[in-house]
Amino acid sequence: SSIGGKWKVTKFKDEIENLEHIVLQLGNISPSTPVMVRMHKLNIYKDLLGLVPTRYNEIGRAMQRIIEHKNGLLVILSAGNSSIEKDHSDKLKEYGIGAQILSLLGVKRIKLLSNSKLPKVIGLEGYGLQIDTTEGF
């Protein structure tokens, strides 16, 4: 990566929504150690075109934070073709997809990079996941 580090790229296919999600992994993941995780819902208008200045280069900034931590995961969830804000049930579905991906990668403990001070993420226990700490982003 031009940002730094050797990243492993893994693609996950959501068969129900017919979407592909990407995980960028730096370093090794251990179930016994908290893993720095950034969940990012891709929006081409906000992320790539810079239409919302606060989101510009958010992926690059997340990668930099993970590099500083020496290992971690950046989970990029595809939004598909939708540019309309999702309702509450869709957001819960996205949490579930993200949790499934983390579980498949062997993550158990999370050090969450989040824009929200106290993100309300429910249902993680069902996937064997727990958020140990949250860091502002």
Locate each region found by the language model:
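Catalytic domains of riboflavin
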Residues: 1-137
